[in-house]
């Protein structure tokens, strides 16, 4: 039986009850559907076997799974199963390119597009905005966004509920910064460059100022849902287990740390919500946690 350990903020030890693949937990609620969850394997990833998996997001029943070099695979989740639809290359595709985090925005470039614009966190903190054309025919560059501050890594995510753009930044000393911006405007038929300044941030704070618990090491991707920032971390090893941190963006506090080390010994790369279920991507498969 798969067993989950949940750790909560303020170093509270949780009480966990186990049933038929359903796991009850106590503490602050992960705000999806209920105060318990089930775990299911949604399917094996079918991308390029030679490349590592990175970011993932879901919109309109389609999951876009990104890999190093800028290859993306589109999966159709509408039929209940995870079926491969198309494999494409981002406009930034190259041998050294990365798509550490991918996040759907709130705007489509054209009415015919099935998916909203895709915000791709690449090398050196650069954020590339991409249009996936209707019927997944091609991927086009729309905008390049940079930030005037230097960090070891920046994972960008759009909050589909509020329309704000979040930057989860890793400092050189291992601490983390959260910044919130308005989403820069895009125009059809125009590829633009936007240079954000730290002074443009609507909010900017150090996570460790509000939280002194378990260090967030080996963070991979971020996702915003219902006022909470989901942070995937860990390499799936005994010394660096796969964990999902849930950060309250309004209260500026850690709500949960979900330990998935016994569910998967793989890297936990990305997550996204679809039909009230939290899909998580590892280096081999997609799982869904049904809350």
Could you say what each language-model-derived stretch is?
Residues 67-69, 107, 121-124, 168-173, ...:
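Short loop/turn segments immediately following the C-termini of beta-strands
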Residues 205-249:
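Loop/turn-rich, solvent-exposed surfaces of beta-rich toroidal or solenoidal domains
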Residues 22-48, 85-97, 135-152, 190-216, ...:
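Surface-exposed loop and turn segments in beta-propeller and other repeat-based domains
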Residues 62-65, 111, 117-120, 164-168, ...:
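Conserved beta-propeller blade signature
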Residues 48-59, 95-115, 151-163, 215-225, ...:
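Structural signature of eukaryotic scaffold interfaces centered on beta-propeller domains
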